[in-house]
Amino acid sequence: MSSPEKVEPQRAILESFANPNPQRDYEIDMHCPEFTCLCPKTGQPDFADFRITYVADEKCIELKSLKIYMWSFRDRGAFHEAVTNQIMDDLIAVCDPRYMQVQGAFYVRGGITTTITVEHHKERSTEA
């Protein structure tokens, strides 16, 4: 099990492809309902439903690579907050979107559900 302080990224798994319509803003919504990682305190599995919504710039996320990337967390210990932010950071590094929201809705553990939502807005140039 990985150290709870750091989620080991599998960024190299992620792939992108050229956005077929970069001149237009359009929303891409991906749903990953079978996410699993390990609780860094107990080693027990944590299950989550991830929703990734973004507006692509020049690149889009390739779906098969996203699936394999999300599966790569199955044997990793990670706090909910850390893993959600790591997923956001890795996706931004791969596709540099105009906008992205990553939401991880973790299933009940000890009578408590946790939902972590992170957003990214790309800074646009103000030059004319």
Curated annotation (Swiss-Prot):
Which UniProt keyword terms apply here?
Cytoplasm, NADP, Oxidoreductase, Queuosine biosynthesis
Give the GO terms filed under biological process for this record.
queuosine biosynthetic process; tRNA modification
The pathway this protein participates in, as annotated, is:
tRNA modification; tRNA-queuosine biosynthesis
Record's catalysed reaction(s): 7-aminomethyl-7-carbaguanine + 2 NADP(+) = 7-cyano-7-deazaguanine + 2 NADPH + 3 H(+)
Chief subcellular location equals cytoplasm
The EC designation for this entry is: 1.7.1.13
> Which residues span the membrane?
none
Any one Gene Ontology molecular-function term assigned to this protein's record: preQ1 synthase activity
Residues that, per the record, bind substrate: I61, E62, L63, H80, E81
Q: Name one GO cellular component term.
A: cytoplasm
Extract the InterPro entries matched here: GTP-CH-I_C/QueF, NADPH_dep_7-cyano-7-deazaG_red, QueF, QueF_type1
One protein family per Pfam:
QueF
- What residues make up the catalytic site? C39 (thioimide intermediate), D46 (proton donor)
Q: Where does this protein reside within or beyond the cell?
A: Cytoplasm
Q: What is its biological role?
A: Catalyzes the NADPH-dependent reduction of 7-cyano-7-deazaguanine (preQ0) to 7-aminomethyl-7-deazaguanine (preQ1).
Would you identify the family this protein belongs to, as annotated? Answer: Belongs to the GTP cyclohydrolase I family. QueF type 1 subfamily.
Q: What is this protein called?
A: NADPH-dependent 7-cyano-7-deazaguanine reductase
